[in-house]
């Protein structure tokens, strides 16, 4: 492990390898490269000190260097203990950007690194957060509440909360009042994923959101592309790299049929699996049925299916009783943000055999075994390298524009959760059309007037569902 200077990465010697892959990724990320061209001279993020908590991948490296090109100072950590690509982290560290991320880091290190991305060398404070899952935001808000006298650190509900609370207490002791100062310095947060967005909306509804937030996840060019088309390619990639199991002919169960579930079902179906879906929402259940999938109860298929994938963003979706009833060598994995969709903690007292990194064989007393991928964390990033660069370009262009919005227009945003305006959503899409050879039909003035839009867009109302 290298700890020289202001970074922690697995091996700084991997920087050249990482740089070569970053160069390839840049050619597949036209949105971010266009942002550099458009904003590189004016540097709208000059003065921004961005704390970033998002998977430290090659694609994220292109995002980080775009933010820097637009004038920002950046400190970065991964939002998942298994998702870092060590050569990407090394390349970013070698470029001079402080990054704290190692694939397979411990939970203790994860929260230490989350603290480090707020600790600037000159003792200053972050003024922006770029988050994925909400952990960086939660770290600051929980600490500030503790400083205000609230009893928020006494009753951890999981091992991870116990570790998180210990790290907060350590910072409270080392820097009294720091959390409150850091909270008050934040101009805004941009949130990448469904789970983190849900956290922000809950805070907003309770009146506990102390700064503006932009919900990047619900930009159409994020949720309908990253969540769907990204998962469509990366889920099967992760299962294959982890298990080398042939999916054609297998029965696969996808728990949840939101955007991630839709992409996951398509991924498995495209690999030849016979896909069944479980769903609590009647609208999503009807969509699944009309897309040709059998919608079932997990309990009815748990003993016969071969592959189980959770996509819900909820907790305890696959429980210990389900896994106990599975056939021998069933594959169990998750592509939702957190690891609590699968009741992994209840498996800890069983026999675990590590097959290779992020692949474990777990044996039940009756002799049946399951293959657990990435310990129930994001398997597409733990067992593979995540979504392809092109689709991540759309997501990260949204992030870049959202950071510019909140940093440069503080008077236009109050302490609520916002979505990027439609014209910016359409802009993100436009930036990715040339790469695919797409030619847009242009409306005449008469046609545009007939449907009540501008010939240049936006073309849909805010409530339109794509």
Swiss-Prot record:
Top enzyme category: hydrolase
Function noted in UniProt: May play a key role in the regulation of the intracellular concentration of adenosylhomocysteine.
Gene transcribed to yield this protein: ahcY
Protein name in UniProt: Adenosylhomocysteinase
Gene Ontology cellular component annotations, sorted alphabetically: cytosol
EC number: 3.13.2.1
Organism of provenance: Rhizobium johnstonii (strain DSM 114642 / LMG 32736 / 3841)
Cofactor binding, per record: Binds 1 NAD(+) per subunit.
Pathway info: Amino-acid biosynthesis; L-homocysteine biosynthesis; L-homocysteine from S-adenosyl-L-homocysteine: step 1/1
